[in-house]
Structures are given as structure tokens and as C-alpha cells.
């Protein structure tokens, strides 16, 4: 796997990281404000945490944070009930990113909710992977755009000279609402994740709901992918950390 990555995926990943640093440089003031906001919430690693956690921090170019609450969502029903509830409460923006989005029962409920919030004045920024969602019809995307949502595919390459790379995919599943609540995990947007598909039957996967400073870190992950796909940096909350819901 490592040699294959080195041959097939190395240059694209390097380009992705360069694009992320470019986004930071282009919006340096906002990035400095974000880092200043996050500094009091950085976790202090001790013992073996320094050895292993430090490696993860260097690889991700992000710090571990303290003062978060993590709510485990153990199936698709719990996951999308919580996601829909959070989106309903959105006042400023919703960030959405999934590997697979389907034009089925769940997919259309999701689309209709985002369209309604967009018409209410909430900004919607939506990324989907062009291979994972290759069956998504154009009318689905067009409907969201007509409602005012910004929806874009995550391409495997950038620039006309780059060859297509099916291996460089984006499997992230992220939702962030107003920079105050976030979701990340294993569920995509499709009926099978609710366990109602006749083809797949019962489905077991896990998501988590986050509050606290980790939400802004998750938002930064989305921003890197969004800039890669669009060369745009949307105006987001980088300076206010919403306290965790619990202790």
C-alpha cells in the first residue's frame, strides 16, 4: 500500500497540503485570529501522549484541544436526527461534506432541509466526492444551487494537465453549524445508513456530535478541502468558541 501511495497519490497529497497552506497565507489575519482563539484550549500532552499525540499533531498540523463534549451516535437514525436538529437551528451557515450522497429518501430530506435554510438566508457550503457520489443526478445539484446553496464536487486533481486519479478520494463526512456544533463519523447520506435498504439490510456505523473548541478545528479541516475544490474561503466564525454542552 505504501509504495502504491508513493507512486500514485504522493503528488496529489503534496499539492493538497500546499493548497491548504496557500489558503492560510491568503487569509493570514483570519487564521491568526483563529489560532489566538484556540490557544487557551490546546491540550497539554504528558507521558506517552507526547510521543504518540505529538506525531498526530505534526501530521495534521493541528493541536489536541480540551473542554469538548462528544456525544456518541450509534446508528443512522440517531445520527441524522441530531444533524437535522442542528441544521434547523442554524442562523448563519452550514458546512456539509460527504463521500456518498444519494438521491433517495434520506438524500432528498437532507436536500430539502438545506434548500429551506438557504432560502431563509443561511449560507450553505456543500462538498461531495465526485467518485463516491458518481450516481448523484445533476438535478439534485441544480436544485440546491437554485435555492442559493454553494455545492461543489471534490475533484481528484487540480488543473487541466493533471491526470485523473481515482485513488485520491475524500471520504470525510462532516457537518458544522455556525461554528458551534459539529458532526463527524462513518455515515454517508443514503437510505442504507438508516438500515431500510432491501439490498443491504441492517446497517451499523458510528458518528459523533461535538461541541466545544474542537468544532473550530473540524471547521478548519472542511476549509482546507473547500479551498482545494473552489479556491474560495467563505466567511466563518473563527473567534468564538461555544462552550461544551456538558461538563
Where are these regions (language model features)?
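N-terminal localization/anchoring segments of enzymes in phospholipid and broader phosphate metabolism
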Residues: 1-247
